[in-house]
């Protein structure tokens, strides 16, 4: 004998079955960034909760200030996620030099951006290797290192890297200066076997400081 089920119970059962059939994606966010076409949060503004490959398609000629309200993001110098990379963590960036930090290079353009889905400041693990293709001396990192040489790495280059957990930003010089390279556990399978895979702007093996990206 079938036991009667009211409409509310039927909906609950259906929802539960659907959740089992279609599990939620691993990366749900939330992410939120607000960009402005003038410095100091003036001018035209637009909010985003997902990637933007070309800000010009939204009527902007450039991004000159921004606010990150949720999540961590990567900003790119050029459209289609190319050029120099800038890690954008929660906070306010009134001018281009706020996101380029102590970068030795004067770059005022920010034309595309996307969320960093794998950022996890608490659980982050990175293995660096002396040579490309994961060969040679290696070192496991689980913390922030303003100077790899002071940590005992011994030289100013890293040949290849494996991101086992989280997301990391590597810098060309000590003290988190110079070119930024964002490495993620959900890109390239977390494996970066050569500097050419660090980003379209990468030109050298030189990395001298590394830190975890905060979500």
UniProtKB/Swiss-Prot annotation:
Modification after translation: The N-terminus is blocked.
Region of interest (Connecting peptide), residue spans: 118-123
Domain of life: Eukaryota
SMART domains: XTALbg
InterPro entries the UniProt entry points to: Beta/Gamma-Crystallin, Beta/gamma_crystallin, G_crystallin-like
One Pfam entry name: Crystall
Domain Beta/gamma crystallin 'Greek key': 31-70, 71-117, 124-165, 166-214
Gene3D superfamilies associated with the record: Crystallins
Statement: the UniProt record of this protein carries the keyword Repeat: yes
GO MF: structural constituent of eye lens
Entry comment, domain topic: Has a two-domain beta-structure, folded into four very similar Greek key motifs.
Function: Crystallins are the dominant structural components of the vertebrate eye lens.
Family recorded in the similarity comment: Belongs to the beta/gamma-crystallin family.
Name recorded for this polypeptide: Beta-crystallin A3-1
Organism of derivation: Aquarana catesbeiana
Lineage of producing organism: Eukaryota, Metazoa, Chordata, Craniata, Vertebrata
């Amino acid at each position: 004998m079938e036991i009667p089920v009211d409409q509310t119970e039927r909906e609950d059962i259906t929802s539960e079955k659907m959740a089992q059939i279609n599990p939620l994606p691993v990366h749900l966010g939330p992410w939120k960034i607000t960009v402005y076409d003038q410095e100091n949060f003036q001018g035209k503004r637009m909010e985003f909760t997902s990637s933007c490959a070309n800000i010009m398609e939204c009527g902007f000629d450039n991004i000159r200030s921004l606010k990150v309200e949720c999540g961590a993001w990567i900003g790119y110098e050029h459209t289609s996620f190319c050029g120099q990379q800038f890690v954008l963590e929660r906070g306010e960036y009134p001018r281009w030099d706020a996101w380029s930090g102590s970068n030795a290079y004067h770059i005022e353009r920010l034309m595309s951006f996307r969320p960093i889905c794998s950022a996890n400041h608490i659980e982050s693990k990175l293995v660096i290797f002396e040579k490309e293709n994961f060969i040679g001396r290696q070192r496991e990192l689980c913390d922030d290192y303003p100077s790899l040489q002071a940590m005992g790495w011994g030289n100013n280059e890293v040949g290849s890297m494996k991101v086992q957990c989280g997301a990391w930003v590597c810098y060309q010089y000590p003290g988190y200066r110079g070119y930024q390279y964002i490495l993620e556990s959900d890109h390239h399978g977390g494996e970066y076997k050569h500097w050419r895979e660090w980003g379209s702007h990468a030109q050298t093996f030189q990395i001298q400081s590394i830190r975890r990206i905060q979500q």
